[in-house]
Amino acid sequence: MILNCPHFQQQDCVSCQWLEKPYATQLTDKEIDLKRLISPFILQNFTEILPPVQSSQKQFRNKAKMVVSGSVERPILGILKDQTDPQSGIDLCDCPLYPTEFEALFPILKDFIARAGLVPYNIAKKKGELKYILLTQSRYNQSIMLRFVLKSEQKRPLVERELPNLLAKLPKDSVVSLNIQPQHAAILEGETEIFLTEKTTIEENFNDIPLFIRPQGFFQTNPNVASQLYATAQNWIKDLAIQQFWDLFCGVGGFGLHCAKALQEKNENVQLTSIEISASAIASATKSAEQLQLKNITFASLDSAQFALNEKSATPDLVIVNPPRRGIGKPLAEFLNQLGTPYLIYSSCNARTMAQDFEALSNYSLQKVQLFDMFPHTSHYEVLTFLVKKS
């Protein structure tokens, strides 16, 4: 086994299903899978398949999602081995994927749970308050986003009473919030977010691009690999003749901001339109662009497919897509195929749906492919591709 993990050895936690596979074999298996899926689109003497970008094998995650079980005096942070049995809690505070700083944090959180009387939610009895603790760390300044997922606001006064003591033990610039999830269902978070700190975002920084992480927003879980992913996209397009481009499914702006910064260094009139359905992610991306003093950038909180299908302005020179696992879907893929933009960048966490989308992009040739091992010890991976319009 490449990581010493007692939880895997005892089969208490098997999230890392490939933990017994040597890391080199993991990478090879992922490459084989990727090449099999995209083989119809690989062109001899044209498609460049670049070497995979490797990950650290431990402590690479910036995030922990902990189910809270046990008792208020002795809370267990980790997972339930049996989703229907509240007594089946497995403590994962020593998970080797978490940053080293989390180790000192978990005892502080357990103490806080006891002091604030946050009784762990019992799924069998439908009683208790605290369902999950969600933690995210910035590698840039070690600040923490700490979210307590509760059944109701009932314990808020006690939490606020104990908060100053907790904040004194957390890194500077940390964010603490209560997320209210009243449903008796295995749903990670509810719609209501109550901030207990003045700050509502933590700052990350990849390649001198500030990125802001908010509750309920998507952010890559492997910062070292993610920063290389964005830098690679930036490198692929920085010398191309691009006047305007779109960044669809833009999230907090990682791809678009990296590319805009590089392109505007040569031509300040380059225009970027970034589209993302999540309003809070767009707020984060806007904040980043302001801090970078980038001009000619338009952000909109819209459905990416709806935006593209209804957009009547000039054809962009580049379109970047970074969709969720379901892919961009046939209507958007067919539209982009007809739109005729010279260049496409497609970043995917699901090569199967990406390959399906490629079938509709028949006017394009696959020029570059690179695998990014965002999710070591699992079968999942990220892939970055560059497509050019056929002449």
From Swiss-Prot:
Which enzyme class?
transferase
Q: Where is the active site?
A: C349 (nucleophile)
Q: What biological process terms from GO does the record include?
A: rRNA base methylation
Binding residues for S-adenosyl-L-methionine, per the UniProt record?
Answer: Q220, F249, E276, N322
Give the UniProt keywords, A-Z: 4Fe-4S, Iron, Iron-sulfur, Metal-binding, Methyltransferase, rRNA processing, S-adenosyl-L-methionine, Transferase
Q: Which residues form a coiled coil?
A: none
Q: Which reaction does it catalyse?
A: uridine(747) in 23S rRNA + S-adenosyl-L-methionine = 5-methyluridine(747) in 23S rRNA + S-adenosyl-L-homocysteine + H(+)
Q: Which Pfam families match?
A: tRNA_U5-meth_tr
Positions bound to [4Fe-4S] cluster: C5, C13, C16, C95
Gene3D superfamilies hit by this protein: 2.40.50.1070, Vaccinia Virus protein VP39 (3.40.50.150)
Name the Enzyme Commission number(s) assigned to this protein. Answer: 2.1.1.189
Any single GO molecular-function term of the entry would be:
rRNA (uridine-C5-)-methyltransferase activity
Q: Which domain of life is it from?
A: Bacteria
Q: Which family does it belong to?
A: Belongs to the class I-like SAM-binding methyltransferase superfamily. RNA M5U methyltransferase family. RlmC subfamily.
Task: Outline what the protein does.
Answer: Catalyzes the formation of 5-methyl-uridine at position 747 (m5U747) in 23S rRNA.
Query: Can you say what this protein is called?
Result: 23S rRNA (uracil(747)-C(5))-methyltransferase RlmC
Taxonomic lineage: Bacteria, Pseudomonadati, Pseudomonadota, Gammaproteobacteria, Pasteurellales
Q: Which gene encodes it?
A: rlmC
